[in-house]
């Protein structure tokens, strides 16, 4: 049918005639010059053969390649650009690879099995965490003896400080991969663990958070799993459903505080910023919601810190250790937006995640810090329909579908966006599709949209980043980190310390000077805002 193609060509002619597309892009010299500059930069790349003092892994939960592309366009359009020519912070990382995300038992994985792969270096089974594939989902008696050790745990044993930052609950599958061993990723609190499993000795994830290893910084959501049943939540005291859930009567926050003389617990943004500036604070736990943290578009900026602010606070504390640090940073609600088939939520979460990556890059040095950005898995999220460049990423394709109705350029293969109106697919308008609450249409009706099984990108910068190349198993990521920092099982890595130091554990440039003006200014504003 010629109709859609004719409309597309007419639209393109109109777009060019209106001057939307930069006129210089019509000249081949523009593209040749751009490519020559990129080639020149590539020729200057020199692998950093030194050891990494610090390790940061940024995990975009559910951030497949289509999500990265769409978020890049959205970030540009928010700055009044056409979109695709924009660079995300992660795009600037010089080394890129693809990661195969399958679990031992599934083509398409969950976040528990993938966390085991990229944090522990071993593939496991669907919905298990920190266990080899010899462990079976929901079978407590297969836990013991099948535990695998995370890079974060190895970093702690090597004398480094370690931290976990996430926009989900801190007991969620991705961050739990750094410290927990469980046959069921949903065992957040002891109330979620069957009595039979508790009798067999299986611990809930919240208990493991404070008992399995000494984590210096813990920031995210998940308050309700740390307190006894009936404990009112400080932010929602009248909502019983948001209060403590524990059946064992334990106050895990108090138990954690008692372990460390310099420990501090906070539950709002003001307390976080104050604690991060206090030199007496050696350990910091911040739990800012009963469950997952709010989406960025719903965040109360007076109470809830952004992912970037949590990352800054974590870096401020962790960088005090002259032996270096390991930091896990997760943009966890990208995944949740996709499961809801709400692309607006997923993409704005991706941009917030990218902002945290950019800020961390400003506060650390690639001379001594290996930074990796990746996803645990993708989603059945597509971007197509021949939209005109510069048109809204949330807009409509220029042509109609065979049912003579409009369709959006962003769609899902399955999910809750499958809706029938009078027995047919409903028409959609530009104003509807641009709403933050809009669910993109799906081909198959499901209560929740599913993960996808294609490879995901890995971006790398810093010492040993050149090892990130080609198409690799997801487990390779953990091994690159361990080798770069000379952690088990690569303690005999034979890597030289970075220039200007006598050993790889020597302190490098501190993030403290860069952070102090920002945090002090923020606290001053907060004090002014709350003054009577």
Curated annotation (Swiss-Prot):
Transmembrane segments: none annotated. Residues 504-532 form a propeptide. Mg(2+) binds at residues 61, 174, 330. Its EC number is 3.1.3.1. GO terms for cellular component: extracellular region; plasma membrane; side of membrane. It is an enzyme of class 3 (hydrolase). Pfam families: Alk_phosphatase (PF00245). CDD domains: ALP. Residues 1-19 form the signal peptide. Its cofactor is Mg(2+); Zn(2+); Ca(2+). Disulfide bonds join 140-202, 486-493. Glycans are attached at residues 141, 268. Zn(2+) 2 binds at residues 335, 339, 451. It catalyses: a phosphate monoester + H2O = an alcohol + phosphate. Residues 431-443 have a biased composition (Polar residues). Alkaline phosphatase that can hydrolyze various phosphate compounds. Belongs to the alkaline phosphatase family. Homodimer. In most mammals there are four different isozymes: placental (ALPP), germ cell (ALPG), intestinal (ALPI) and tissue non-specific (liver/bone/kidney) (ALPL/TNAP). This is Alkaline phosphatase, germ cell type. It comes from Homo sapiens.
């Amino acid at each position: 049918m010629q109709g859609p193609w004719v409309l597309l060509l007419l639209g393109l002619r109109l777009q060019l005639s209106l001057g939307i597309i930069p006129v210089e892009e019509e000249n081949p010299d523009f593209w040749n010059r751009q490519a020559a500059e990129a080639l020149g930069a590539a020729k200057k790349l020199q692998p950093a053969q030194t050891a990494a003092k610090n390790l940061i892994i940024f995990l975009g939960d559910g951030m497949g390649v289509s999500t990265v592309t769409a978020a890049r366009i959205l970030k540009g359009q928010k700055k009044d650009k056409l979109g695709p020519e924009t660079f995300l912070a992660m795009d600037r990382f010089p080394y890129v690879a693809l990661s195969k995300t399958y679990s031992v038992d599934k083509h398409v994985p969950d976040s528990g099995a993938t966390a085991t792969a990229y944090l522990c270096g071993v593939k496991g089974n669907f919905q298990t965490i920190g266990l080899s594939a010899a462990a079976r989902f929901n079978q407590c008696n297969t836990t013991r003896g099948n535990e695998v050790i995370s890079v974060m745990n190895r970093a702690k044993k090597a004398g480094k400080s370690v931290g976990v930052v996430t926009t989900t609950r801190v007991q969620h599958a991705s961050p739990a991969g750094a410290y927990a061993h469980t046959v069921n990723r949903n065992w957040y609190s002891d109330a979620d663990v069957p009595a039979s499993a508790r009798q067999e000795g299986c611990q809930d994830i919240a208990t493991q958070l404070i008992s399995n290893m000494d984590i210096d910084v813990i920031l995210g959501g998940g308050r309700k799993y740390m307190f006894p049943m009936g404990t009112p939540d400080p932010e929602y005291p009248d909502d019983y459903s948001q209060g403590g859930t524990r059946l064992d009567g334990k106050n895990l926050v108090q138990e954690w505080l008692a372990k460390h003389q310099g420990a501090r617990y906070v539950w709002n943004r003001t307390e976080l910023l104050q604690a991060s500036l206090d030199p007496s604070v050696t350990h910091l736990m911040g739990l800012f919601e009963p469950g997952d943290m709010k989406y960025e578009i719903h965040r109360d900026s007076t109470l809830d810190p952004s992912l970037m602010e949590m990352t800054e606070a974590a870096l401020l504390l962790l960088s005090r250790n002259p032996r270096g640090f390991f930091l896990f940073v997760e943009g966890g609600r990208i995944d949740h937006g996709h499961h809801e088939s709400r692309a607006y939520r997923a993409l704005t979460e991706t941009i917030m995640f990218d902002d945290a990556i950019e800020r961390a890059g400003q506060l650390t040095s690639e001379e001594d810090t290996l930074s990796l950005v990746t996803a645990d898995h993708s989603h059945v999220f597509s971007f197509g329909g021949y939209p005109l460049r510069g048109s809204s990423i949330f807009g409509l394709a220029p042509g109609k579908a065979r049912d003579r109705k409009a369709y959006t350029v962003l769609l899902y293969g399955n999910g809750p966006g499958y809706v029938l109106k009078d027995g047919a697919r409903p028409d959609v308008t530009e104003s509807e599709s641009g709403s933050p609450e809009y669910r993109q249409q799906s081909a198959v009706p499901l209560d929740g949209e599913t993960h996808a099984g294609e490879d995901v990108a890995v971006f790398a910068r810093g010492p040993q980043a050149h090892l990130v190349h080609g198409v690799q198993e997801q487990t390779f990521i953990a091994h690159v980190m361990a080798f770069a920092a000379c952690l088990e099982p690569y303690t005999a890595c034979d890597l030289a310390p970075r220039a200007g130091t006598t050993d790889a554990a020597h302190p490098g440039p501190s993030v403290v000077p860069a952070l102090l003006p920002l945090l002090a200014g923020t606290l001053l504003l907060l004090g002014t805002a709350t003054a009577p």
